[in-house]
Amino acid sequence: MTSLPLGVKVEDSVFGKPAGVGAGQGPSAAAGTAAAVSVDEEGAKPKVSPSLLPFSVEALMADHRKPGAKESALAASEGAQAASGGAQPLGIRSGSLGAQDSPSSPRPLGHFSVGGLLKLPEDALVKAESPEKPERTPWMQSPRFSPPPARRLSPPACTLRKHKTNRKPRTPFTTAQLLALERKFRQKQYLSIAERAEFSSSLSLTETQVKIWFQNRRAKAKRLQEAELEKLKMAAKPMLPPAAFGLSFPLGGPAAVAAAAGASLYGASGPFQRAALPVAPVGLYTAHVGYSMYHLT
């Protein structure tokens, strides 16, 4: 504070009585009075540490942890200040946030403060994230929400064609019998009852076996004949020449070409038909059209 001028009354706010400064008093007395007032005002102001404020980092983090946020923040800040060796009045510490020191106040939240997290060893931080013992919530452990076990997909069973129970086994013809049957089929594809009975007895076969063999052989001959006809049709089909550069020419020789050109040039013959404009075919002129605009000298 600045010293007051001589001859001015100053009302002391501390003691509540006026202090007159006369002409006989020197400037040293006025300076002493001002110094006393400043000391008293400074002593009346409480000293509050910025770490104990409700908007500090410790207080904000403690508010999200437990309902006793202010008490836990005060305890964490007191522990940090005691470790650093900072002195602070007891009355200010207990009355700044309206909390009293009691043995029942919770103090384990110091580990969740910024200073506690920074001071923790790396093993403690890594251990919480290690997948050795994965912790699950109770609703995840219930079988209702657990994933179903993987099912092994078995290959589908191959369904075979079922034959009749009274199906006769296939007759194993010998080479001599097959040659005789082929020779007889070339001679005659259909056998009468008497011919079939005589031929089957000569080959030591039954009439039914000879009859079925001739039926199968006729079906095979029909399939081969149809395949040969299809090949002949494909060979007899004329190969159409591809259109050169997309230009098709009418059939009939040069006369047909001239007739078509005249029809396109003069249009169809009729009393009310307008003459069509001649169109130059593409590719007939090798020089560019723009060259005809200039006169060569």
Swiss-Prot record:
Basic and acidic residues composition bias: residue spans: 127-136
Q: Does the keyword Chaperone apply?
A: no
SMART domains on file: HOX (SM00389)
Tell me where on the tree of life, at the top rank, the source sits.
Eukaryota
Q: Region entry Disordered: which residue ranges?
A: 68-114, 127-157
State the GO CC annotations.
nuclear periphery
Compositional bias of kind Low complexity: 71-87
Where it mainly occurs, coarsely classed, is: nucleus
UniProt GO molecular function: DNA-binding transcription factor activity, RNA polymerase II-specific; RNA polymerase II transcription regulatory region sequence-specific DNA binding; transcription cis-regulatory region binding
Q: Which terms under GO biological process does the entry name?
A: embryonic morphogenesis; inner ear development; negative regulation of gene expression; negative regulation of odontoblast differentiation; nose development; positive regulation of cell cycle; positive regulation of odontogenesis; regulation of odontogenesis
PTM text: Sumoylated by PIAS1, desumoylated by SENP1. Sumoylation of Lys-9 and Lys-127 not required for interaction with H1-5, transcriptional repression, inhibition of myoblast differentiation, or binding to gene promoters.
Cross-link Glycyl lysine isopeptide (Lys-Gly) (interchain with G-Cter in SUMO) lies at: K9, K127
Tell me where it resides. Answer: Nucleus
UniProt keyword terms in alphabetical order: Developmental protein, DNA-binding, Homeobox, Isopeptide bond, Nucleus, Repressor, Transcription, Transcription regulation, Ubl conjugation
Binding region for DNA: 166-225
Its quaternary structure?
Interacts with CREBBP/CBP, TBP and SP1; interaction with these transcription activators may inhibit autoinactivation. Interacts (via C-terminus) with PIAS1 (via N-terminus). Interacts with H1-5.
The similarity comment for this entry is:
Belongs to the Msh homeobox family.
Q: Briefly state the protein's biological role.
A: Acts as a transcriptional repressor. Capable of transcription autoinactivation. Binds to the consensus sequence 5'-C/GTAAT-3' in downstream activin regulatory elements (DARE) in the gene promoter, thereby repressing the transcription of CGA/alpha-GSU and GNRHR. Represses transcription of myoblast differentiation factors. Binds to core enhancer regions in target gene promoters of myoblast differentiation factors with binding specificity facilitated by interaction with PIAS1.
Can you say what this protein is called? Homeobox protein MSX-1
Which gene is annotated as encoding this protein in its UniProt record?
MSX1
